[in-house]
Every structure is written in C-alpha cells, then in structure tokens.
C-alpha cells in the first residue's frame, strides 16, 4: 500500500484509521521468529477464508490427527516448588512440574498474581499467558490482566529463567539462563524434528500450557469455569494447538500466531518443509501432531484471533484458514499497524479484554460481521453486521503471488444501523477483499475493531 489519497481508479488508499507506521516496541526475538525473512511494511488483509460459491477458495480439508500427550495425566494438578532466582514485585515466582524429559520431571518457571481485594463469588477469572519465540515469563503481562480483574500466570516455555530488562523484568539478569530441571529449549523453528516426540520442544510447550491450566484450577481463589488462554506469536501457534487438546479453557485468544505453517508462502517458514527440509515421515508427523490445523476442528470454546494488517511472520492466508478451521465460535480482530511483539500483543489491542469480559463476566460482545457479498449488478461490496461501528472500509487487492508483497487499497463504506455498504464498486481483477469496521470515541480513541471473513476471488 502506498502513501496518497487515491489511485488511478479513484479508490481511497489510506483511510484515516490506518495512517501511520509501526510503533516502537520490544518485539518478539526477530532473529528467532523471522530468520531469512525480509520484513517490509506491506499491508495485508486478514480474516476468515470464505469458501462458499464457485468464485472463492475451497473448504479446508480435515487432517487426521494424533495426540502424543497424555492429556489425562497433564490434567492433574502439578507439584509446585519455590523459586527465589527471579523475584518480581507484587507476584509469586515458582516452578511447577511439567512433562517428563528423558525420564525426569521438568520444572517450569512461572509468575502468578491475583487482583487485589476479595475474590468474587466462585473465585477470580484467570488467564494463562504463553510467550512467543525468544520470550519468557513477563511480569507486566501478568499485571495487565490483574489490573483488569483477572488472576494470571505467565511461564517460560523454553527451559529458561526470565532475564533482561523488558516488560517488568527486574535486575537485568542474563537472558536465556537455564536451570537444572529444565525441559528442552526451542531449536529455531523445527530443528528438533528428528528427535522422539517427547524430546521435541512443541510437545513440552503444549504440555506446559495444559499443566498451567491444571494448576490454576487447583487454586481455591480461582473459578475453574472461567479460565482463558492467550499466546503471542509462536505462543499463538502453541495455544491454537492447545485449544483443540484441552477443552477445559473458557476461551482462547491467539495473537499473530496460527496454524497451517506448512502452507505459508513466507520463505522464513516455508524453508523448514519439503522439499528443503523434513523427511516424508517427519512431515506426516508434523501435520498430524504438531501443526494446529490438526487440532483446531476439536476446539469448541470461543476464540478471538488478533493480528495486525501487516504481520511479518504469519500471513493472512494461513491466519484466516486457521480461524475458519476452529470448531467453535471464531471471531477476528484486525488492528491496523499492530506491531509484532511482546508488549504490543497485550497492550495495543483492547479487544482482547473486551472479548474475555464478554465470555466470563457477561460484558458487551465485540461486533460481528457477516460474510461480505458483491452485488452482481453494481459490483458494490456489502455486509450485514451486529455491533457498534462509526466507520468502516473495504480492503481489497488486485495483486496475486506472495501475500507479503500484495498491495492493498481501500474504499470507504456507508454505515447504517445493520449494514455496511461500499461507496464505490470493486475494480475488475480484485483477487481478495474484506470489510472492516471500528468505533471512534472521545479523544479519537478507536475500539471495537472487527472484520469480516476474507474473500479470495479465483479467476
């Protein structure tokens, strides 16, 4: 998408809602997450893949899955051990027991806190927080939830003790420090693919998240019916798998991360799969066990999928396909210029907390758009919706090829009580589009970001 007020077709190119650039912030470890990937600020549309009718893409095919985890054993409360190595103000630091690694139980470092005051009837709602690649347990992520009335646990999923000075870390201690009872560290994306299942990082990351749920459910101050899960980047991919394996969660919110990694046209992801990497058996195991695509059809809880329009790691096609594959209610939140990073992934999308409040506190729901359609006589895109919008736009592209390289343009919509209608027709050659809305409040604050399904138009 290029700067400017319009193109040769008279289409708007930068709606006021999306002017600007990516903000500064402490990102997910870019070396780990985006290796061999040249990151450009290129808008990409998002959302659920529309598959009805002859002109759009086909339904995702189901994948036969295998479950390498002993879910029954992981559903039992884990043992907890004291931790003095990495204190954080206002919260508990401890180890809890994870899955066995090479015949020995692992210990998982975690921060945990509850809101101040007396718990509500039934106990606090709670959230499990799964970090992304190169990340760790972050105190400020826990604090973001506790200030909103939730208990929260954030754990290190890479066999490390927390370190550094970002996101509430204290002491500026070394990054990536291990401990004697750690499980396996992550080896790039799939560098451990030749190892036995129970020695691979994804196996332990998923198990550690399930165990965190089991721990919360055992605490007397927690309401076991109101425990949610969220993950950022690679953590978003992990929680997308957990959603289909651990049915006890009340809601799941993947941020940036998703499934169908093997179908990505991002060179940094595609390099790990055949023909460059993985044997035929390893690829079969990956699809059946480790990719969220195998497990998402079994995820029946409400899910909110959150990303920016220019995410540099998980492109629109696989993100949208993941959302469509989920077996329960699946909603999408499109935040223009949501930078890919820890901090950004919990601070810059208030819809995360609106969604959680709706599920476990009875708060108002996020808006919901129906599948957009094109009037065959006029070429005008439109969709019905429920919710509170003051502004809406059609995002469309006439480009093909890699999603990262596609250019996107915009057409403003008229907002009526129940329908969003584009003010101009889509140009010939449109290859994909969606309709996106939000509410502008006092001080130009934008909220209620939501988008329709992504429609891919085949030639």
Predicted regions and their residues:
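Gly/Ser-rich "nucleophile elbow"/oxyanion-hole loop immediately N-terminal to the catalytic nucleophile
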Residues: 121-123, 187-232
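Surface beta-strand/loop "capping" patches
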Residues: 357-396, 409-419, 423
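Short beta-strand element of the alpha/beta-hydrolase
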Residues: 121-132
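N-terminal cap/lid segment of alpha/beta-hydrolase-fold proteins
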Residues: 72-122
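Primarily recognizes the serine-hydrolase "nucleophile elbow" in alpha/beta-hydrolase
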Residues: 210-275
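Catalytic cores of secreted or luminal carbohydrate-active enzymes
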Residues: 312, 316-375, 387-388
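Cap/lid segment of the alpha/beta-hydrolase catalytic domain
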Residues: 143-207, 258-273
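Short beta-strand/loop motif that positions the catalytic acidic residue
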Residues: 299, 305-307
